[in-house]
Regions:
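Glycine- and acidic-residue-biased ligand/ion/polar-headgroup-sensing regions
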Residues: 63-76, 80
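Acidic/histidine-enriched, glycine/proline-rich intrinsically disordered or flexible terminal extensions
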Residues: 120-133
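Short acidic-glycine-tyrosine-enriched beta hairpin
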Residues: 81-99
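Asparagine-centered strand-capping/turn motif at beta-strand->loop junctions
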Residues: 6, 102-104
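Single conserved hydrophobic/aromatic residue that forms the stacking wall/gate
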Residues: 1-9
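A short glycine-rich, His/Asp/Glu-containing loop-to-beta-strand
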Residues: 22-65
């Protein structure tokens, strides 16, 4: 981008873009991607794709339950310190307060349904990584 175009962007467009409050519906990350599929008053449905060898943080939520349905691939889930293998068709339920994570052995696609009265990205407590996985 030329410096003139960059200046126009900073002065004329950036203030508008910065003020958007619309929720991000798709994002690519180093570990894979996610796409928000449905938003309701007390639920949020997301398709999560983890790249082979990648994992999500070990974490919990205070105000929401989560249900994972594995729709493609194989990997491992850790739920409250217990590791188990997961594959296409498996369904896992994590109540609020439960520590959990996924690790992809192959590409792993999961439908994640978040259930609760106050679903928020701030409702996530991270824990140190588990060793070994």
């Amino acid at each position: 981008r030329s410096s003139a175009a960059s200046d126009v962007y900073k002065r004329q467009i950036k203030p508008y873009v910065s003020s958007f409050t619309q929720q991000v519906m798709f994002a690519e990350k180093s570990w894979g991607s996610f796409r928000i599929m449905d938003v309701e008053k007390e639920s949020l449905t997301i398709k999560v794709t983890l790249n082979p060898g990648h994992k999500m943080n070990y974490h919990s939520h205070e105000f929401r339950d989560e249900v994972w349905t594995v729709i493609y691939g194989e990997g491992r889930a850790v739920i409250d310190g217990e590791e188990r293998r997961v594959k296409t068709g498996d369904v896992l339920r994590m109540p609020a307060g439960c520590r959990h994570m996924l690790l992809a052995d192959t590409e792993l696609q999961v439908i994640e349904v978040q259930l609760g009265k106050d679903i928020s990205v701030q409702d996530k407590k991270k824990y140190p990584p588990l060793k070994p996985l």
